[in-house]
Structures are given as structure tokens and as C-alpha cells.
Amino acid sequence: MSALLSKTIKTEKTEKEYPDWINTLTYLYPNKNLCKFSDNCFNTCLKTSGRLPMATKAMINRTKLLYQDNDTFINNLENELRKAKKSANKKGKKLAYRFNGTSDRFEEIKHFLDMDNQPFHQAYDYTKDFKRVLDYQGYKGYNLTFSYDGLNNLEAKFLLKNKIANVSIVMTTKRNEELPKTYNLNGIDYPVLDGDKHDLRFTENKGYIIGLRAKGKAIKNNGSFVQSI
């Protein structure tokens, strides 16, 4: 059975940037049931960002378990998280967990947030669900970053203006190039933070654009999801 927690180059970079934290994620195989707001980004999803066949197979296996035996999925995930948290504690560190590495669900992570003894020290996610951000930003420590897709301008503007959440934007900036210092959204210039340097979005103040470089099929995307720089 595939492990439900994953380590990546991004989590390694995160742990170097923040040595007091252990970072782990869950990667499911994206589909429109997992990501109900995926119409504008599904074809350029992170599932295409250079994953090897074995990694893709593991994502599919996790997703099958989620749908076919959700109770077992939840139990196995809790066991893995508690083991990771215990390991982090022994090292004098904290565990930061992102459930939606390649999905946009809430039921499972809310289950863990509602526990008296959460199986992590900090949970965070990216989401395109505007109402979820309004209702659950800060819920029992949960941190949310709103994902911009080129069409949810008004929602992004509201969250930035009121400093409710930062907004992530995928840009055409190449991997070896610097992201712009500011980005104009709806006529307003917002400061940009480099979201590729680490993944601990909960460490950042609100009111920022989180710039992400396009990866996989998104590099050649001409749709609304990836923003030209």
C-alpha cells in the first residue's frame, strides 16, 4: 500500500529555509471530484509537473483508497501523521502538514483539525474555494492561501484588500529567473513573495501575492490560469 505522506524537493527546500519545521504533504491524483473549481487549471495541474511513473501510481492508489475505503484512508493517514509528529517532537521540531498537495478537499483535513490532539502542529493549504477561506481561515490554526486562476479577480481583490488571505498566482517566470517585485491585480500593485523558496505559507503576513513559477504543462499554457510576466 502506498504511503499517504510525501516528501519532495519543495519540502526539502522548506526544511532548509525553516530548520525548526518538518514539512510533509499528501498527493492525490487530481480529478474534478477532488477539485471542484478546477475548470481553468485542470489541464495544467501539478500532476503534470514531471512526476515519475511510480509517483503517479502512488497518487492513483491513494485516491482509490480515499474513495473506496475512506475510513481506512483516514485511519492510515492519522497513523502516519502521528508518527511524523512524534519524530518531529524528538528532534525538537514541529510538523507542518498540507493535505491538498494536488487536490482541493476539506472533509478529511477538517476531521483532523477538530481533534483535541491534532496529529500535526500546523495545517495549511491552497484553495480556490472562496467561501472556505472566508469561513475557515484560522480555524483551529488552519492557514489558507487563495489560488488565483485568472477569473476569480474579485474574490482575490477582496481577500488581499482585507488581508484575510494571501493569493497565489502561477507566472510564466522561468525557474532560473527572479519573480517580479510587484504584481498588478485589478489596478492595484501588490508585493510579491517567492512561493517556490518554501511552502510554509502560514509564516507570512497577509496582503501579498505568492508568486509560483509555471511547471509541467503549465509552462506552455495559454489559458487564464498562468499569468504572463
Predicted regions, residues:
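Class I S-adenosyl-L-methionine
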Residues: M1-I229
